[in-house]
Amino acid sequence: MPGGVREADHDLANRLAIGAGEILVELRARMFSAGADHWSVKDAGDAAAQRFLMDELTTARPDDAVLSEEGREDPRRFGGGRVWIVDPLDGTREYAQPGRVDWAVHVALWEDDHFVAAAVALPALSKVFSTDPASPMPEVKRRRPILVTSRNTAPPAAHWVANGLGCDALRLGSAGAKSMAVVGGTADIYVHDGGMFQWDTAAPAAVAMAAGLFVSRIDGSPIVYNERDPWLPDFIVCRPELSDDVLRALWG
């Protein structure tokens, strides 16, 4: 930074999510215009966004560890402290389809036992959701809550919640896009129990919690990040007034 001023963590998270997203948007348009197949576009996007994030974090936060879907294991994260949990391209399938907008970039900073900063960019929509400034939780008035699920097959937990609460459905691609639908007020509930990884939900969880939403495992327990095993079996984000009903639909 100019004059040796350290960039604030929130500002860095925002800048990285936006910057990676801009790279992805430009690369996708250029490659499709050149006639590239979807596999090539997906792989090139993953690599370009990962390279950008790692280069920037290495420069801006050389002492911090990184946990990334596309990166090598960073053993420094096992000692605790500051760990950036990133997904350079959440929703590769959607990214590799011209015109799809439901893909995201995730950047989160976890320190010891809590989030410090995070941002989720939806680059194709020119949107970014952050922990600072946090997104205000919108007021919604609906007769039936909206449950956001995967485009293809909804997991069992989603069926239980949909039946228990009489939900309408919204189908989207990536975990980031689904989570931000709840943050933005387009949906009310996102439930997933088909398994994912920490980088799939870290930034969405942080942004959702900063907005005042309810976030947990499907048993209602808090999610702990930077675990040695990056596998994360399940995830809930919903409006706080629906959390008891969601858990009741899951567990009775």
Per-segment meaning from a language model:
Residues 1-89, 160, 214:
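N-terminal subdomain of lithium-sensitive/metallo-dependent phosphomonoesterases centered on the IMPase/IPPase/PAP
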Residues 20, 24-27, 46, 57, ...:
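Residue-level signal for inorganic ion chemistry
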Residues 47, 70, 88-91, 123, ...:
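Generic detector of well-ordered alpha-helical packing
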Residues 62, 80-81, 113-115, 142-144, ...:
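Short coil/turn connectors at secondary-structure junctions
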Residues 65, 117, 188-189:
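Short, Asp-centered acidic motifs that coordinate Mg2+ and/or phosphate
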Residues 68-70, 132, 173, 219:
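Short loop/edge segments at beta-strand edges and connector loops
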Residues 78-134:
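DPxDG-like acidic metal-binding loop motif
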Residues 141-252:
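An extended, acidic
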